[in-house]
Amino acid sequence: MDFKNYSLMLIMRKTMRLKLFLFAGMLMLGMAGLNAQQIIAHRGYWKTDGSAQNSIASLRKADSIRVFGSEVDVWLSSDGVPVVNHDAHVTLNGKELIVQDTPLATLRKVKLANGETLPTLEEYLDAFAQCDHVKLIIELKMHKAKEREDLLAKQVIDRVHQRSLQERVEYISFGIHIVQQLRKLDPQAPVYYLNGDLSPQILATMGLNGFDYHYDVLYKRPEWVKKAHELGQKVNVWTVNRPEDIQKVIDLKVDYITTDEPLLVRQTIDKQ
């Protein structure tokens, strides 16, 4: 072999090693991205100008920052219409009203902090259909009677399916009866339990996709994260806002972080 060919062979070997090194680095970065926690904006991205909790603006703003999901709370009005609000009560002209005991016409007079009218689920889903990036995480609130919870679950599932949005929507609830109804009405839907009192093994017998617990629950029972993953379940935690808690739940290897501070959570994840 002459010197010219030998030099060429050395260059080719070095080039190949460099390519392999770069490929391995890209693969590791890709795996890190796959393993990184996903962010869910709690009641939408509302800590920003022009937004408010559970407003349509908060949904659109969550979509604009490209988080995994935007969470929203749904009640049934007294006349059977799903409406969007977190608390069990709203205030109208200085008077406190119970959402589930109030007709839609009255609830529509309520204004959110950003001036929006309290939205119906129909309006929220129509706005969501125009979003490009987020999933919608719908929390169905517990009601006084199981019959009302049944009606709420059916109304929500029907409205999602009517718009062919089922691949983009997930469901959560504190109510055992509600999550069971959701599973019955839509066997393929991702359904998660919120209350923090049931083990992954019990949730598996219910056919649920995992749990969405307050972070304090997992601080006391960190083994539930590993057990859930062994059972093929996903783990979400709420509502994680402080830097120290964000880091703790990342270290616990949860799958999703629900937060009022989506940009802070993203910055923390990116630093890992």
Task: Give short role names for the model-derived ranges.
Residues 1-38:
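Bacterial Sec-dependent N-terminal signal peptides
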Residues 30-272:
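Phosphate-group recognition and catalysis centered on beta-loop-alpha active-site segments
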